[in-house]
UniProtKB/Swiss-Prot annotation:
NCBIfam families: aat (TIGR00667). Its EC number is 2.3.2.6. Pfam families: Leu_Phe_trans. This is Leucyl/phenylalanyl-tRNA--protein transferase. It catalyses: N-terminal L-lysyl-[protein] + L-leucyl-tRNA(Leu) = N-terminal L-leucyl-L-lysyl-[protein] + tRNA(Leu) + H(+); N-terminal L-arginyl-[protein] + L-leucyl-tRNA(Leu) = N-terminal L-leucyl-L-arginyl-[protein] + tRNA(Leu) + H(+); L-phenylalanyl-tRNA(Phe) + an N-terminal L-alpha-aminoacyl-[protein] = an N-terminal L-phenylalanyl-L-alpha-aminoacyl-[protein] + tRNA(Phe). GO terms for cellular component: cytoplasm. Its main location: cytoplasm. It comes from Nitratidesulfovibrio vulgaris (strain ATCC 29579 / DSM 644 / CCUG 34227 / NCIMB 8303 / VKM B-1760 / Hildenborough) (Desulfovibrio vulgaris). It is found in: Cytoplasm. Coiled coil: none annotated. Keywords: Acyltransferase, Cytoplasm, Transferase. InterPro entries: Acyl_CoA_acyltransferase, Leu/Phe-tRNA_Trfase, Leu/Phe-tRNA_Trfase_C, Leu/Phe-tRNA_Trfase_N.
Length: 234
């Protein structure tokens, strides 16, 4: 397997077809906003653990939720309709990152959200490209997720919950909002049973790249996101 070393002075990536069987494509570079946005445009994302160099991935197949195939399980929709949680956008981005980083993940000895990753996504948030969706209960943040928006694609990064269904409710609000805004898909990156229940599929990389190309031709919704006053996700 060939592993590419990225230069520090140019935001370039090798062709994703050069990725290894596990999706690993390249090593090194940096986490500047320019490089991160270029990576997402090309179907690549960073993922590495404490003490590791920056690793860049483009798995094949790719877990993707086409938003026209969104399915909300009936029991979960009852929870959404019950309004147990107040859902907000972009009001506690740093707190969502902190909680995602603190959440234990099966098979991982430590968090992949190392401090430099949190700083990088915080910069993207301040530039209006990264967003948080938060579930609140009694004035307390109890669940949420964050990701990057580019054109008509949303690239989900991580989620957490401190109460049952909190992150799932936040995701339903996000997905329905993205549909109303004309987004095409949510990139789930890694396959999970949780996302498959929402209608996600394992998409061949070539098909994902075609969807990505079409989606990134749409204008990006840059800036702080707010829920439309009359929006409901049902």
């Amino acid at each position: 397997m060939r592993l590419y070393l990225l230069p520090d002075d140019a935001c370039i990536f090798p062709d994703v077809g050069e990725a290894g069987p596990d999706g690993l494509l390249a090593i090194g570079g940096d986490l500047t906003p320019e490089r991160l946005l270029r990576a997402y445009e090309e179907g690549i994302f960073p993922w590495y653990g404490p003490g590791d160099p920056i690793l860049w991935w483009s798995p094949d197949p790719r877990c993707v939720l086409p938003l026209d195939a969104l399915h909300v399980p009936r029991r979960l929709m009852r929870t959404v309709r019950a309004k147990t949680f107040e859902v907000r956008l972009d009001t506690a981005f740093a707190d969502v990152l902190e909680q995602c980083a603190a959440t234990p993940r099966p098979g991982q000895g430590g968090t992949w959200l190392v401090p430099e990753m949190r700083a990088a996504y915080t910069r993207l948030h301040h530039l209006g490209h990264a967003h948080s969706v938060e579930a609140w209960y009694g004035g307390r943040l109890v669940g949420g997720l964050y990701g990057v928006a580019l054109g008509g694609g949303f690239f989900g990064e991580s989620m957490f919950h401190a109460m049952p269904d909190a992150s799932k409710v936040a995701f339903v609000w996000l997905a329905r909002l993205l549909v109303s805004w004309g987004f095409r898909f949510v990139d789930c990156q890694q396959t999970t049973s949780h996302m498959l229940r929402f209608g996600a599929v394992e998409m061949p990389r070539t098909d994902f790249l075609a969807c990505l190309h079409d989606a990134t031709r749409q204008p990006s919704r840059i800036g702080r996101w707010r829920l439309p006053q009359d929006f409901v996700p049902w």
